[in-house]
Design a protein with these regions (language model features):
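An N-terminal, globular interaction/scaffold subdomain
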Residues: 5-105
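Hydrophobic alpha-helical transmembrane segments and immediately flanking/interface helices
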Residues: 113-125, 190-210, 273-290
């Protein structure tokens, strides 16, 4: 083994170790904070403990989301912050509806308000914690919006489309994981409230959140993807005009389409990613049946 290879392997190993240690530290700190805030409340059932663990786990997911997309965020916010921040603000408002709606229609959802069940310390902690999560999710959605604007403003190039494809895939997957984790936490919140015997938090709420998050993902993802397909088609047609190409060019055309992600496999992966919140909600409801 050469010294360069050993150094590369050693560096990768240290990065992996530091990443695991960082994730563990974030989880431990959040778990201790949530546990401390929950002292003396009616949130002490096993279901509530699982819910508190999921809350801490979400913090790790959010930190990972920022780390994975940090380079793109810095680049975009320096060069063209308007579309990203504008879209992110709209997504924050949209996601905030999941926090506001239960309070507006509290009589239909709760016998007692959540803060009365959780206590002020835990309730306030969860409120601000979730708000941070909304901002992280919104920034990732803003990166997708920037990709959409970039496709509209610039003439398609191979390098540009490959970069856009990677961003769309990474951001969509990241946003899906964030929303599915939120669905899981909501499901265990519902079970915690039932265990406390203090409210009527219907399981249908979990399903409605899954449906809402799926619709939001589609609204964020579809316009950018449609423009990506349009730009990729334009580039392929410009390089291999349909009326002129022979068998060899047809194979090259197909290879280029595959490289750009215009395949059935990519379409299936995108469908799974965008539908993951509703799939997660259905699974949570099914697993939660007595």
């Amino acid at each position: 083994m050469s010294s360069k290879t050993w150094k590369a392997d050693s560096s990768a190993a240290w990065k992996a170790i530091l990443t695991l240690l960082g994730a563990g530290a974030i989880y431990l700190v959040l778990a201790l904070l949530v546990g401390y805030a929950a002292k003396g409340t009616r949130f002490g059932s096993p279901a509530a403990e699982v819910w508190r663990s999921l809350i801490a786990g979400q913090g790790v997911i959010w930190a990972a989301a920022l780390a994975l997309n940090w380079g793109d965020l810095v680049k975009v916010l320096r060069a063209r912050p308007g579309p990203t921040l504008g879209y992110a603000a709209a997504v924050v408002v949209a996601l905030s509806m999941t926090m506001v709606a239960p309070r507006v229609f509290s009589e239909a959802v709760f016998v007692l308000p959540k803060f009365e069940i959780m206590g002020d310390a835990l309730g306030n902690f969860v409120f601000w914690f979730v708000l941070v999560g909304l901002i992280v999710a919104a920034l990732i959605a803003g990166l997708i919006a920037d990709a959409f604007v970039g496709l509209r403003r610039q003439e398609p190039t191979y390098a540009g489309l490959m970069e856009t494809r990677q961003r769309l895939q990474r951001c969509t997957a990241t946003l899906s994981v964030i929303l599915v984790a939120a669905i899981g936490a909501t499901s265990w919140l519902q079970r915690s409230l039932e265990a406390a015997s203090v409210g009527s938090y219907p399981k249908e709420i979990v399903f409605s959140y899954g449906l809402y998050f799926t619709a939001l993902l589609l609204v964020v993802y579809l316009p950018a993807t449609a423009d990506f397909y349009r730009a990729a088609g334009w580039l392929v047609d410009a390089k291999f005009p349909m009326p002129e190409f022979d068998k060899d060019q047809a194979e090259k055309r197909g290879a280029l389409l595959e490289e750009l992600g215009i395949t059935k496999t990519d379409a299936l992966q995108a469908a799974v990613a965008t539908l993951s919140p509703i799939i997660g909600a259905v699974l949570s409801m099914a697993l939660g049946k007595d």
